[in-house]
UniProtKB/Swiss-Prot annotation:
Keyword Transmembrane helix in record: no
GO CC entries: cytoplasm
The protein, known as: Elongation factor P
Pathway the protein contributes to: Protein biosynthesis; polypeptide chain elongation
Keywords in alphabetical order: Cytoplasm, Elongation factor, Protein biosynthesis
Cellular compartment(s): Cytoplasm
Job of this protein: Involved in peptide bond synthesis. Stimulates efficient translation and peptide-bond synthesis on native or reconstituted 70S ribosomes in vitro. Probably functions indirectly by altering the affinity of the ribosome for aminoacyl-tRNA, thus increasing their reactivity as acceptors for peptidyl transferase.
Natural source organism: Synechococcus sp. (strain CC9311)
Gene: efp
Pfam families per UniProt: EFP, EFP_N, Elong-fact-P_C
Length: 187
């Protein structure tokens, strides 16, 4: 059990048979009446967002999520297959369960798979990944006066803005949280 006073961004609770993650919260103490906590909750399974208000000190069931490190081994149709490298047990996730994470997911990558009641809910990517540029416009000499950027499509299909001097085949580091270029990767 968790009190609504203890809500923080990222806290997970069980509500109406589903798992919800606190995206925003605000403790409100009006001049008249009792205090309350106004929250914005995101459903972990579906991604829908709702605003909900709780009484201050209201007790709620905290969702106990388990994280396990699995390796993405291959695709089978529309399913992503992951393997626990210690037990060699396979876990299958649909494209819907993977969500936006699939644009950075490549075979052989290790990720955290979050489960609740032994059901996989979502995939947590590392904060940054190294990917190869598959397609981009060639850089034109002398076109860097303003330090401009150009779109690049990576080997997984993700699109990020990269500096003009980068070309096809180069490996770059990308921040998976906000889809930004972090730098070149050597080696």
């Amino acid at each position: 059990m968790i009190s609504s006073n203890d809500f923080r961004t990222g806290t997970t609770i069980e509500l109406d048979g589903a798992v919800w993650r606190v995206v925003e919260f605000l403790h409100v103490k009006p001049g008249k009446g009792s205090a309350f906590v106004r929250t914005k909750l995101k459903a972990v399974q579906s991604g829908s967002v709702v605003e909900k208000t709780f009484r201050a000190g209201e007790m709620l069931q905290q969702a106990l999520l388990e994280k396990s490190t699995l390796q993405h081994t291959y695709m089978e149709g529309e399913d992503f297959v992951f393997m626990d490298m210690s037990t060699y047990e396979e876990t299958r996730l649909t494209a819907k369960q993977i969500g936006d994470s699939r644009k950075y997911l490549k075979e052989g990558m290790e990720v955290n798979v979050v489960t609740w009641n032994e059901k996989p809910l979502e995939v947590e990517l590392p904060n940054s990944v190294v990917l190869e540029i598959a397609q981009t416009d060639p850089g034109v000499k002398g076109d860097t006066a303003t330090g401009g950027t150009k779109p690049a499509i990576l080997e997984t299909g993700a699109q990020v803005m990269v500096p003009l001097f980068l070309s096809i085949g180069e490996k770059i580091k990308v921040d998976t949280r906000n889809d930004t270029y972090l730098g070149r990767e050597n080696g």
